[in-house]
Amino acid sequence: SKAKMAIAKGEARAAKIEGITPAEIERKIRLDVHGRPKPAMRGWIHAVATPLALAAGIVLICLAHGIGLKWACAVFMTCSLVLFGNSACYHLGDWSPRVTDVLRRIDHMNIFLLIAGTYTPVSFALEPFWRNSIIAGMWICTTVALIIHVIWISAPRWLYVLVYIIFGVSGVAFMGLFWMSPYAGPTVVILLCAGGACYIAGAIVYALRKPDPWPKVFGFHEIFHTGTVAGYACHMVAIYMVIVQLWP
């Protein structure tokens, strides 16, 4: 229509004045819900991680001994697929405002799911009492965090990061148990801590919005996404080592 053409011409004229290229305008319309052009890599890191997480999860399930541990690995795989898959869809797709809001809420909640999903199979390295206590505690905290995120989606960025960090380091309280476990040991503890450090480092970059090395291609948000993938990889290897140690 004439109205849409007039609006498009006005946007193009404003973009020319601000020095924004047509390619950046297209990216802005397709991807950015905040009115800012997104880097070209936005969403692609998690898009690539999604099929890799599926393959890794299937391997863990096949290697796990016992129905309980297999289900625990399935929980970990599901949580990782939901995180990476939803993030890729959210950042790459051109969605309506309602769909964007739903994907954004899920995106903000997923890291809590992945942390709880990680401790679900790892805790099989411990005695049943501690295993059940950790799994129950993690999922109760996750449920509370999810409720907060659903109700207060517009919470300040710093609050999201604070809750994220507290949740991420909460497992430190159990590291002594994993260290002494014959089915885990120092290597598993180091991997769990390294994964947590990757999550925290990424969260700090996300909160500070810097470093922002190449804003048009690979910015601060991509560093955050890289941190989540690196943390996931560390934890996936830790789960693999526990599974191998639990073989009869």
Residue ranges: model-predicted function:
Residues S1-P248:
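Multi-pass alpha-helical transmembrane bundles in non-GPCR membrane proteins
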